[in-house]
Regions:
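Active-site-adjacent helix-turn-beta-strand microarchitecture at beta-sheet edges
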Residues: 1-32, 79
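His/Asp/Glu-enriched, well-ordered alpha-helical/loop segment
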Residues: 26-36, 43-66, 71, 77-80, ...
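Ligand-binding beta-strand-loop-alpha-helix segment within the catalytic cores
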Residues: 88
Length: 170
């Protein structure tokens, strides 16, 4: 992982202890329910995916046993493992669309363009879904899915900034 732009040691924070994650995995396995974890950034996503990767699907139907919410800047290895094990990723391209200034300030242009590698995830077989993240999105109508879809299809922010054309979806 790399730190936020202009820092040497700021990577984000973990809000879930290892013991809490283990208890969530144990509960979901016992009750055959889907584990849903929130993870943004390479380290957080790798931590969740690596832990879940050690398990076999415990669901009694074809529902993915793990859903990782808020996928932003996943490592290549996490994408591969998620595809291999049938994990489900949820991501919000609306953020690069609606909050482009923050992405450019904190990540820079090159990193921003790779934050939401949706084309790569789909091409590698990851089960993927977009969401608006309403009401947290700072857009005029947070629950409107169309700006999110527009961002995924055009890979342009509201102001026209290129957000990584190689990751467009159709």
């Amino acid at each position: 992982d790399k730190p936020y732009l202009g820092t040497t040691d700021e990577y984000g924070i973990s809000t879930c202890s290892d013991s809490l994650m283990e208890s969530a995995v144990a509960f979901c396995k016992k009750h055959h329910c889907q584990l849903s974890m929130h993870a943004m950034g390479g380290s957080a996503i790798s931590r969740v995916v690596d832990r879940a990767y050690r398990e076999e699907n415990w669901m009694e139907d074809d529902t993915p046993y793990v859903r990782v919410e808020h996928i932003t800047a996943p490592a290549t290895d996490s994408i591969r493992k998620a595809a291999e094990k049938g994990m489900f990723f949820v991501t919000q391209p609306i953020f690069m669309y609606a909050e482009i200034e923050s992405y450019l300030t904190n990540l820079g242009e090159a990193w921003m363009k790779t934050c939401y590698p949706v084309r790569t995830m789909l091409d590698q077989g990851v089960q993927l879904c977009f969401s608006t993240d309403a009401p947290a999105t700072s857009w005029a109508v947070p629950s409107d899915p169309f700006p999110c879809l527009k961002a995924a299809v055009t890979r342009r922010a509201y102001d026209g900034t290129d957000c990584g054309q190689d990751q467009r979806v159709d």
